[in-house]
């Protein structure tokens, strides 16, 4: 057992347990060393469970009992077959400790128990855990973010990205320079924000449309590209998008190259009113007569023709001004445009408030109109009834008799219809009950089959999950096998195992030989006992016949009887001696077993722990009294 203990201690050292060099057997293990060995093994086997356990034995007795119970529960969760409690850790015995450590050593991973080149300790465990995580991530194939499952998103990560979804925008185009843009659009054309229902796609659609307009403008400015827009508009949507993208890439490169030149003449600012009209062209385009808001907008933002001519004539002069004057003019123009935009926004807010007020008034008027129509219809119905009654008043008696006759006919007709309905209702009710019963049976059968199908689906899912888990374990084991060094020599362990097996075989042969010799000896004893009994019986019979005639024969008979009695006592004494020797050997084995369990030392430890526990309780009671 010492050789087995040394192999087990070597495995514990590989798992990270700091076993002193002078400890060669499990009999020398202390309580602190037992707790540390079990915790280190649990951390290697299941880091999630072992990370919450401390390898150091606490000083307080209550904390010791809690730690021992936690270790026992963790080992039982791993599948330890024998009974386990706190006493197995605080007061360990050699056989129980050997069984427990062998159980844990068998469940140690391969790299923790056989790879002797790896360092031991917490850092080694951390490095091995990091390596296993990296191997798992490298073993998984790369998947695009939109196709990742939640597990892959957890492993590989997935940022919250929004795809670029652009929609085709329909805006009015200028067919002639002199005609305003709002009169060229269709009355049914919606505003640009309304054409894109998703808020996420509005910015993308505007960017794409702006880039397309820029590319079209650049294409118009270049000679030979005037019909490019008409050519792309006649293409299918996919080819149109592809052609626009290629055209855009070429034109943007040239546009950016030209934009980084020297600052030239500032581009003439577009009329803000025209810009707002182009933005909201779909709202009111078919009105031949402008509203008050339109007139105020034109009055506020429309430039005078003379000012426009002056601005156009001043463009060459402005281009010759210094750069600072140009920037100042641009800033001033930008400030004026901002002020105009704020005024327009305020006007829009006022108009929206008026529209909301008018909308509320319109809803109230509609509700009042509906109520008036309902009350009018009710009054008309009552008026018709009263007018009919007034018409019947001149000949009241005859009309009353006619009405009575009509009522009686109606009652008879109702009774007749009730009888007919009863005739039809009885078979229909019976058929309904029959069909309801069949429906209930079908529902029960359907529910039963549905339950069977659900159970079958669950079993299929469980089998698929189990197969997937086993496949992952197989791949992990194969990857670990590939990473293991090929030059690991197990010759010493194999040779030692073969020697142990040979010794066991020799011991078995010796035990078999001893058992066979014992059986032969038992047979010989039995045969000699039977032969002795038969010889004594014959001799007793012969001597007893002659004992009546001769005194010497009588004395010989007495001596024979005494000899037989003494031999019987001697045999009984020998048997008792053998029984006692067997009991002595059993007691010696029990003594060795009890000595191996360290009963006396455990009792002494229990007494010390009991005294420490009483001291702790006394201290706690003193604190309670003081509080």
UniProtKB/Swiss-Prot annotation:
The modification Phosphoserine is found at residue 410. Keywords: Coiled coil, Cytoplasm, Cytoskeleton, Disease variant, Endosome, Intellectual disability, Phosphoprotein, Protein transport, Transport, Ubl conjugation pathway. Residues 1-447 are annotated as: Sufficicient and required for interaction with CCDC93. It holds the Pfam family CCDC22_CC. It is found in: Endosome; Cytoplasm, Cytoskeleton, Microtubule organizing center, Centrosome. Residues 219-230 have a biased composition (Basic and acidic residues). GO terms for biological process: endocytic recycling; Golgi to plasma membrane transport; intracellular copper ion homeostasis; negative regulation of canonical NF-kappaB signal transduction; positive regulation of canonical NF-kappaB signal transduction; positive regulation of ubiquitin-dependent protein catabolic process; protein transport. Residues 218-243 are annotated as: Disordered. Residues 1-321 are annotated as: Sufficient for interaction with COMMD1. Its main location: other. One of its GO terms (cellular component) is cytosol. Residues 320-627 form a coiled coil. Widely expressed in adult tissues and in fetal liver and brain, with highest levels in prostate and lowest in skeletal muscle. GO terms for molecular function: cullin family protein binding. Belongs to the CCDC22 family. Component of the commander complex that is essential for endosomal recycling of transmembrane cargos; the Commander complex is composed of composed of the CCC subcomplex and the retriever subcomplex. Component of the CCC complex, which is involved in the regulation of endosomal recycling of surface proteins, including integrins, signaling receptor and channels. Involved in regulation of NF-kappa-B signaling. (Microbial infection) The CCC complex, in collaboration with the heterotrimeric retriever complex, mediates the exit of human papillomavirus to the cell surface. Component of the commander complex consisting of the CCC subcomplex and the retriever subcomplex. Component of the CCC (COMMD/CCDC22/CCDC93) subcomplex consisting of COMMD1, COMMD2, COMMD3, COMMD4, COMMD5, COMMD6, COMMD7, COMMD8, COMMD9, COMMD10, CCDC22 and CCDC93. Forms a coiled-coil heterodimer with CCDC22; this heterodimer interacts with the guanine nucleotide exchange factor DENND10; the interaction is direct. Interacts with CUL1, CUL2, CUL3, SKP1, BTRC. Interacts with SNX17 and SNX31. Interacts with CPNE1 and CPNE4. It is linked to Ritscher-Schinzel syndrome 2: A form of Ritscher-Schinzel syndrome, a developmental malformation syndrome characterized by cerebellar brain malformations, congenital heart defects, and craniofacial abnormalities. RTSC2 is an X-linked recessive form characterized by intellectual disability associated with posterior fossa defects, cardiac malformations, and minor abnormalities of the face and distal extremities. This is Coiled-coil domain-containing protein 22.
